[in-house]
Swiss-Prot record:
The gene is SE1. Belongs to the fantastic four family. Pfam families: FAF. Residues 1-31 are annotated as: Disordered. This is Protein SUGARY ENHANCER 1.
């Protein structure tokens, strides 16, 4: 028999020691729930042993595997929908205003979108450099070889109109 539990506010300890007595301290760092075994047994009496007098004539409980699998799928849910990519002429521009990150959708010219970066291999490393439409990799980054640093890339970004740089990572890939 299932007894309906009285509605109790969070952390409420009533006269009769309702369920709020056991849930009062949930979430504490120590894990102490603030009740003892006697309080738990009061609300949730132990189940009778299998094969006792109540089991005479009872049908055995066989779990329904299909129902259990369906319930598991409902609990897990599916993957969230995929995030939209900047595959078209739209992209997001990030800027900070008053300590908040503001993302603004911007429509870009198709030709400009394709030439933001140029990739090259240099000494076993992949380098991304800002590119102008007619420039080669040397002119876009301000020099070749392994001497270019992150500051050099940021200076190029500051000279470009409409390019936002959040971080420049230099290192072996």
């Amino acid at each position: 028999m299932i007894r309906p539990a009285p509605w109790v506010g969070a952390g409420h300890r009533g006269r009769g020691g309702e369920a709020g007595a056991c849930t009062e301290s949930l979430g504490s760092e120590s894990g102490d729930v603030g009740c003892d075994a006697a309080e738990i047994d009061q609300f949730f009496p132990p189940a009778p042993a299998a094969g006792g007098p109540d089991d005479a004539g009872a049908e055995p409980c066989i779990p329904d595997l299909a129902a259990a699998a369906a319930a598991g799928k409902r609990r897990r849910g599916g993957f969230p929908p995929p995030m939209p990519r900047a595959s078209g002429p739209l992209f997001l521009r990030a800027e900070r205003r008053g300590g908040r990150l503001i993302l603004t959708e911007v429509r870009a010219d198709e030709r400009e979108r394709r030439v933001v970066f140029r990739a090259e291999r240099d000494g076993g490393r992949l380098r991304l450099r800002f590119a102008n439409d007619g420039d080669g990799p040397e002119a876009a980054g301000g020099g070749g070889g392994a001497g270019g640093g992150g500051g050099e890339l940021c200076q190029v970004a500051a000279g470009r109109r409409g390019v936002q740089v959040g971080a420049v990572m230099m290192g072996a890939i």
